[in-house]
Design a protein with these regions (language model features):
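Small/polar (Gly/Ser/Thr/Ala-rich) solvent-exposed segments
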Residues: 38, 61-80, 92-121, 242, ...
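Bacterial Sec-dependent N-terminal signal peptides
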Residues: 1-24
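Bacterial Sec-pathway N-terminal export signals of envelope proteins
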Residues: 19-63, 92, 169, 209-252, ...
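Hydrophobic, lipid-facing positions within transmembrane beta-strands of outer-membrane proteins
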Residues: 83-89, 289-295
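Short, charged, amphipathic alpha-helical segments
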Residues: 107, 170-179, 310, 376-384
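Periplasmic alpha-helical coiled-coil/stalk elements that build and connect Gram-negative outer-membrane
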Residues: 120-235, 337-340, 344, 386, ...
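Amphipathic alpha-helical coiled-coil segments
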Residues: 39-54, 120, 124-143, 161, ...
Length: 417
């Protein structure tokens, strides 16, 4: 029997542990459900297919042209119908650099799409962590308000008893009733905020809104302060910066692509023709073949080439400027993220100390009121101070947890908790 009880206890503990959801598990489920990541992955696949399509420009092409005609007037000795079928195989030898530019552009587009997909993973991961910590904060805030309501109710019982015994005036009873009404209103708001946070939590991972949630991690857990990352390493790790750098290279290739149509073009091919003899007197057909070379040399287009290439170079310059702007943005983002992280860590320590003091003050005030040496106003003021500092602590812990997640997103580093 003892073994059976131990087995049941172990099973219950196992089921309870399995029901809890860790931050890593939630982040994984959000990424698996994310429509944004699915779209980015589809865009990467599209870009990969475009690379294969661009490379077909190096290969010969096979095409055929056909026609059929029927004359309305009858010519003596000549049949009224006629047809022609002309297959051709053409190999482009030189397209002015257009084919190589198209392949290079497609390859860079594929790399850019992969970078965009990686950057979207950072954003989705941060959104998951932000939502997780928000729900944790709303849980703690709801618990603190419930505790606050319990404290006021216990004080109300004491006040009502002392009023019934004639030790205090009616004003004290009215004050505690008013404070209880305010606390119940705060409880209603806290429950609403928790419900909204839970709905957002479930929507982000694609489950039913009524699904109950039990978090295995909390903002009150000890989250280590991450080490600051060297800025050069931050830039080297950012997928969006890599994409912007690739965009500069793509713009350089686009200059060559813009120039290509104005360069000489050379292609060779072999073709055939199946058609009736001309004139078509007997309806008999013949098959003939030919080898050919096609050359196109643009000569004068009123400065069109110069303007097209100049416009492409301006777009290249814009890409370079955008890269420099992104560099400054990442620098600002990293500096502000680190300052916010350090400040929020200090705020957690300060708020924890203040909350301990407020808790001791509440105990002393309640004890003094029970002994008749303090007024109910002193107790109510201590309760308000305790709730405010408790809320400040929750806010500070939430801000710190979010700041850690944000800094890891900024530096493109995986979460370590």
């Amino acid at each position: 029997m003892k073994r059976l009880i131990l087995a049941v206890v172990a099973l219950v503990a196992f089921v309870d542990a399995k029901a809890q959801l860790s931050l890593e598990e939630y982040r994984t489920s959000v990424m698996e459900y994310s429509w944004l990541l699915k779209m980015r992955n589809s865009q990467s696949e599209e870009a990969r297919e475009n690379v294969g399509r661009a490379k077909t420009g190096f290969l010969p092409s096979l095409s055929t042209n056909g026609s059929f005609g029927l004359q309305f007037r009858d010519v003596k000795g000549v049949r009224r119908w006629d047809f022609s079928l002309q297959p051709q195989i053409i190999q482009t030898l030189y397209a002015g650099g257009a084919v190589r530019a198209a392949v290079k552009t497609a390859e860079m587009d594929y790399d850019i799409a992969l970078c965009n997909e990686a950057f979207a993973m950072l954003d989705v991961g941060y959104a998951a962590e932000h939502t997780y910590w928000t729900l944790s904060a709303m849980e703690q805030y709801l618990a603190s308000v419930r505790r606050y309501v319990d404290i006021i109710r216990s004080l109300k019982q004491l006040v009502d008893a002392r009023f019934a015994e004639g030790y205090i005036a009616k004003g004290d009873v009215l004050q505690i009733d008013s404070r209880l009404s305010e606390a119940l209103y705060e409880l209603s708001v806290a429950e609403q905020n928790y419900s909204v946070a839970k709905n957002n939590f479930n929507i982000l991972r694609g489950v039913d809104l009524a699904t109950e949630v039990q978090l295995s991690q909390s903002i009150s857990d000890s989250i280590p302060l991450p080490a600051r990352v060297e800025f050069d390493n931050v830039v080297a790790s950012r997928p969006d910066f890599a994409a912007a750098d690739l965009a500069c290279g793509r713009a350089e290739v686009a200059v060559r692509a813009a120039r290509a149509p104005y360069n000489p073009q050379l292609s060779v091919g072999v073709g055939g023709r199946w058609a009736p003899y001309t004139p078509n007197k007997t309806g008999q057909t013949e098959v003939n073949g030919s080898l050919f070379a096609q050359v196109s040399v643009p000569i004068f287009h009123w400065g069109e080439r110069h303007r097209v290439v100049a416009a492409a170079r301006e777009r290249q310059r814009q890409s370079t400027l955008a890269l420099q702007q992104l560099y400054d943005d990442i620098l600002r983002e990293e500096m502000n993220g680190w300052v916010n992280l350090v400040d929020s860590s200090a705020q957690v320590e300060a708020s924890m100390r203040s909350m301990v003091i407020a808790g001791e003050n509440l105990e002393i005030s309640t004890y003094a009121y029970n002994e008749g040496v303090a007024s109910v106003l002193d107790v109510l003021q201590a309760q308000i101070s305790w709730l405010q500092l408790y809320t400040n602590t929750i806010t500070a812990q939430y801000n710190y947890a979010v700041a850690v997640s944000d800094y890891q997103r900024i530096t493109a580093r995986p979460s370590r908790y």
